[in-house]
Amino acid sequence: MIDRYKHQQLRIGSVSPQQISAWAKKILPNGETVGEVTKPYTFHYKTNKPEKDGLFCERIFGPIKSGICACGNYRVIGNQKEGPKFCEQCGVEFVDSRIRRYQMGYIRLACPVTHVWYLKRLPSYIANLLDKPLKELEGLVYCDFSFARPIAKKPTFLRLRGSFEYEIQSWKYSIPLFFTTQGFDTFRSREISTGAGAIREQLADLDLRILIDYSVVEWKELGEEGLTGNEWEDRKIGRRKDFLVRRMELAKHFIRTNIEPEWMVLCLLPVLPPELRPIIQIDGGKLMSSDINELYRRVIYRNNTLTDLLTTSRSTPGELVMCQEKLVQEAVDTLLDNGIRGQPMRDGHNKVYKSFSDVIEGKEGRFRETLLGKRVDYSGRSVIVVGPSLSLHRCGLPREIAIELFQTFVIRGLIRQHLAPNIGVAKSKIREKGPIVWEILQEVMRGHPVLLNRAPTLHRLGIQAFQPILVEGRAICLHPLVCKGFNADFDGDQMAVHVPLSLEAQAEARLLMFSHMNLLSPAIGDPISVPTQDMLIGLYVLTSGNRRGICANRYNPWNRKSYQNERIDDNNYKSTREPFFCNSYDAIGAYRQKRINLDSPLWLRWQLEQCVIASREAPIEVHYESSGTYHEIYGHYLIVRSLKKKILCIYIRTTVGHISLYREIEEAIQGFFRAYSYDTQSYGI
């Protein structure tokens, strides 16, 4: 369906019998109305043609071959000059055969049938709305017992019987003793109700708004009573309050979606289009049929039997009619959800039939496999590995995947640059993988985003757009900060890559789906591009440093022998176990030359205008120099003062890991301010 904003959407829910009839019924040009499936047959065994009014009837679902009717006559589709649009002999329209993929039929049920999803699945919607135990409703649906239908204030047999006797045999066995068959039918239609028809009557009598009001009043009364002190009673009250909340939410949903409760009981059963439940001929002339066809046949057989009992055979006992209604209910249950009531129905080879629920649910169902996760062209799949040097909005595509995804664009580039006269020559050049091919591929990729998806796609951040670049190897490179949105890690996870082809898809990818535009969680608003897992471990190792404190220094005589190999003679820093550096570049250079370790403590000269937060007011130790200057040593910094106590310089105690992290953060902040100043100048702010 299409909403008012012209967005295609799919909504699953209950529909009215009138809507089912509108889907399936169609009026032929001669005024005849078709759409009802009345026969359980598929194809005639001699002619191999669909049976009339059967499950594959061409009058109902359309022709098997476009423009050819059941008689074999041919008409050009859409040509008004060649005569009528349908065959007057067989009643088949001359239309495209693709109509058999969406044209539905229907079965008119001889008795109402409850939809098993709303009755048996938990929570049971029917039981919640009627506020009755599920076992009681099941007994009513499957004709195990009946209930009295109130008829104003007129005297009825049931009222009279209730006035004289209270304990007597069940209605099912006592009532037929007083009436003949004809009398029983009259009595039954007047005073008692059973089966799904009884459920339908109760649902039709519900006023959802009054139901909500009563539920609110009862919920408030239970809340005002408070705790009773009895644990069992308190639990019972809590369960009742939870039930009332569920009941109100369900009623509000029915009101909001304009769904009537009685629609949960079926009077018309939709029949799927034949192309969605095909019969295929395999080698040897054997036929393979969808299980849905066999389940439909079972429903039609039992429904036709019940129709005959109700219309033609007037001498049929009432018990037999009730039994046949139960069989129809069970057949529809098996069609919708095989095995929901116990043992599933099996074929002659002891194989369980696949019902409608089995066809649509699960990973291999219609939705997840065909509609949501269907295989498409211009897509690939590979393992993801970390790409720490990538930008946040970039991903690395292996050459093997990239050349296949963008092959058509590369072919167009080769032809436009007159490097290939036609498509065949261009493909041969691509197979040769010359340098010009990679140059054109890189040029194409610069202007074309790709979409990365990791299953299962549970929220919108499961699919994000990236700017691709070529990488070596056969794995997709991904920035580690985007892993949380995908719920991915680098232990063998696979991701699919798709190429948006249309201009609308490319614009949507650039404006809405790029990874650097999805930094916050759409659900709770918290940052989602945050370091996780390996990055946190790396940052910890980078900034952990040496656990030795300032007191474990070279003045300890027991440590001098252990750290003699760490003495460094250089003009830039003193000859000590913990060297001094004038700037961060010298410290990182010494680390690259393997003079110090990543976690080795060192003293780095700090700018005087930058504040140093003191952890202790009094210095731990003071060193005096012959020149008159002295060093005040604190826990994490050192101050060099003159004779007049003027601060000459400050050193902080740190590691190469801390310096590297600080420089990365500083560069990121400076880049942000440069980008911000550029934007303000561009917009004249």
Curated annotation (Swiss-Prot):
<dbReference type="GO" id="GO:0003677">
    <property type="term" value="F:DNA binding"/>
</dbReference>
<keyword id="KW-0150">Chloroplast</keyword>
<dbReference type="InterPro" id="IPR044893">
    <property type="entry name" value="RNA_pol_Rpb1_clamp_domain"/>
</dbReference>
<feature type="binding site">
    <location>
        <position position="489"/>
    </location>
    <ligand>
        <name>Mg(2+)</name>
    </ligand>
</feature>
<keyword id="KW-0934">Plastid</keyword>
<feature type="binding site">
    <location>
        <position position="491"/>
    </location>
    <ligand>
        <name>Mg(2+)</name>
    </ligand>
</feature>
<dbReference type="Pfam" id="PF04997">
    <property type="entry name" value="RNA_pol_Rpb1_1"/>
</dbReference>
<comment type="function">
    <text>DNA-dependent RNA polymerase catalyzes the transcription of DNA into RNA using the four ribonucleoside triphosphates as substrates.</text>
</comment>
<dbReference type="InterPro" id="IPR034678">
    <property type="entry name" value="RNApol_RpoC1"/>
</dbReference>
<feature type="binding site">
    <location>
        <position position="87"/>
    </location>
    <ligand>
        <name>Zn(2+)</name>
    </ligand>
</feature>
<dbReference type="GO" id="GO:0000428">
    <property type="term" value="C:DNA-directed RNA polymerase complex"/>
</dbReference>
<keyword id="KW-0460">Magnesium</keyword>
<feature type="binding site">
    <location>
        <position position="90"/>
    </location>
    <ligand>
        <name>Zn(2+)</name>
    </ligand>
</feature>
<dbReference type="GO" id="GO:0000287">
    <property type="term" value="F:magnesium ion binding"/>
</dbReference>
<dbReference type="GO" id="GO:0009507">
    <property type="term" value="C:chloroplast"/>
</dbReference>
<dbReference type="GO" id="GO:0005739">
    <property type="term" value="C:mitochondrion"/>
</dbReference>
<dbReference type="GO" id="GO:0008270">
    <property type="term" value="F:zinc ion binding"/>
</dbReference>
<keyword id="KW-0804">Transcription</keyword>
<comment type="subunit">
    <text>In plastids the minimal PEP RNA polymerase catalytic core is composed of four subunits: alpha, beta, beta', and beta''. When a (nuclear-encoded) sigma factor is associated with the core the holoenzyme is formed, which can initiate transcription.</text>
</comment>
<feature type="binding site">
    <location>
        <position position="493"/>
    </location>
    <ligand>
        <name>Mg(2+)</name>
    </ligand>
</feature>
<dbReference type="InterPro" id="IPR045867">
    <property type="entry name" value="DNA-dir_RpoC_beta_prime"/>
</dbReference>
<protein>
    <recommendedName>
        <fullName>DNA-directed RNA polymerase subunit beta'</fullName>
        <ecNumber>2.7.7.6</ecNumber>
    </recommendedName>
</protein>
<dbReference type="GO" id="GO:0006351">
    <property type="term" value="P:DNA-templated transcription"/>
</dbReference>
<dbReference type="Pfam" id="PF00623">
    <property type="entry name" value="RNA_pol_Rpb1_2"/>
</dbReference>
<dbReference type="GO" id="GO:0003899">
    <property type="term" value="F:DNA-directed RNA polymerase activity"/>
</dbReference>
<dbReference type="InterPro" id="IPR006592">
    <property type="entry name" value="RNA_pol_N"/>
</dbReference>
<feature type="binding site">
    <location>
        <position position="71"/>
    </location>
    <ligand>
        <name>Zn(2+)</name>
    </ligand>
</feature>
<keyword id="KW-0862">Zinc</keyword>
<dbReference type="InterPro" id="IPR007080">
    <property type="entry name" value="RNA_pol_Rpb1_1"/>
</dbReference>
<keyword id="KW-0808">Transferase</keyword>
<dbReference type="InterPro" id="IPR042102">
    <property type="entry name" value="RNA_pol_Rpb1_3_sf"/>
</dbReference>
<comment type="similarity">
    <text>Belongs to the RNA polymerase beta' chain family. RpoC1 subfamily.</text>
</comment>
<dbReference type="InterPro" id="IPR000722">
    <property type="entry name" value="RNA_pol_asu"/>
</dbReference>
<keyword id="KW-0479">Metal-binding</keyword>
<feature type="binding site">
    <location>
        <position position="69"/>
    </location>
    <ligand>
        <name>Zn(2+)</name>
    </ligand>
</feature>
<keyword id="KW-0240">DNA-directed RNA polymerase</keyword>
<keyword id="KW-0548">Nucleotidyltransferase</keyword>
